[in-house]
Amino acid sequence: MKTRYSLFAGLCLMLGAAPVVQAQPGSLDPTFNTTGYQIQPVNTGDGAQKILVQDDQKVLLIGFSFDANYVAHTIVKRFLPDGSVDAAFGDNGTASYVVSFEADTYSAILTPAGKILLAGTTDDYQSQQILLIQLNEDGSKDLAFGDQGVVVQSIGLVTENGHDNAYDVALDAAGNIVICGSSYDENFVPRPIVSRFSPAGVLDTTFGVDGVATIPVNAVGSNAFKGVVIQPDGKIVASGYFGNTELWYVMLVVRFNTDGTLDPSFGDAGIVKYNYSNVDDEGEDLKLTPDGSILVCGISATASYNYSALLVKFSPAGALDLSFGSEGVVFEDLGTFDFASNLAVMPDGGIVMTGTSGSAPPSINFGIAAWKYTASGTPDMTFGTGGVSLPVIPTYGAMIYAMGVQADGKILVGGQARTSSNQNYFLLARLENDFSIGVPELSGNTAAMVFPNPATASSTLSMQISETVQPDAQISLYAADGRLVFTSQAGGMQRDAQRIIFQLPVDLAPGIYQLAIQQQGTRRSASLLVTH
């Protein structure tokens, strides 16, 4: 096995630098705003829902804030890589957006052109509609998108008092906008939905039925998708929860074909429902691993409302991966209120899960929780204490809903800093993290070999796998946040037998990427480090 070196140590050796003592992985990073965190009040009902890391490593913190009249405004804040406020963005670092009524933003994504696409819900107190807002890099609205930068769209089956909500957003290879969430059926039961819009924000009525893909639901209960990802072959995987009864749920994972129909090769006719054994299991976020497996994190609750964090791994076909964790599951019960909100897969295969741990509100005896695992689901003992870190924000409770990973592997978490008088402010914190970068050996049928690695933007890469590269093989490059950066077929590239040769995009930003090749039911991948 090739020796793996940490990125930072490797750079120090190349530069002839003196040895540097690495801070404890999982601890607050004191180089970020000197304390490791930022607390930013807008009003007293603030909450961050999403973190985006730009190519220049500036950080976008996105959520909403309730004003004095309890009306929600969408808020976007931008910070420099060192944690200080970026005064060049919006109004001294903060941009606020309102529509006719409430504007609740739950997710966001950066487009290949550097635009900031926000997704959520607008509420006029009788009905709710899908909300999309697209911003320019400086925080101004992109007036070419939708109606002056805004899309408000009803997608439900009821014509009055409908409830349409977008909880996550992704972009497919064509730049189409794919959102997931929930929408009322004709009986006012929330359905889990995936919907697709054109890059300009127009509902794509050729997708699913009138632009909406869903599954059958029970006559009672609530159902929603909370996370969505696009596979390299264009298929859509969404996770969330399915209402078995009016009060209790099971974890839900569904795969759709590119046209919005259910994929019968996945689970039971496209659907997987998973129950850990408690009365309530819900998926909050999902990520794909390099071999196409699906990781879903969320919660598992007992009938007495003890909440535990849950991480489950499914095979590419939707079966529980019994080799992961304990029979396919990692279960974390640190307190009475453990909630996993976000996942990230590191370039070395490690898994980071973040959320909240402690006692449930209204107390403030809860805070940041970060877990790190090996690729097999065992705790990474180098992280925190026994694989878990519980950083403390003095005098505040902390609820974590968002996570991002910077190019150096450091972990950003965001959400709410809560006072003892129940005032909530925007919170952004950065945690130390240690990870390895290396070219994996070609072993078995899971890995690819890439040279050179590290590379620079516009480098010519050679990628080798263990099979003959077919002309219809799909080559895809993903950023650390899961964003599809580049895709092409091998037929348009130089290739010979088991190798393809191609050039990286000239405007590719420094960072960590995953390079994948998919053909004839197989997927090979490798981590790639791009430097200046």
Task: List the model feature ranges, each with a label.
Residues 18-20, 50, 448, 510:
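A composition/secondary-structure signal for short, hydrophobic, low-basic-content segments
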Residues 443-451, 455-532:
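C-terminal outer-membrane/trafficking sorting elements
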Residues 1-25:
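Bacterial Sec-dependent N-terminal signal peptides
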Residues 18, 189-191, 451-453:
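Hydrophobic alpha-helix-in-membranes signature
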Residues 22-442:
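Extracytoplasmic mature domains of secreted or surface-exposed proteins
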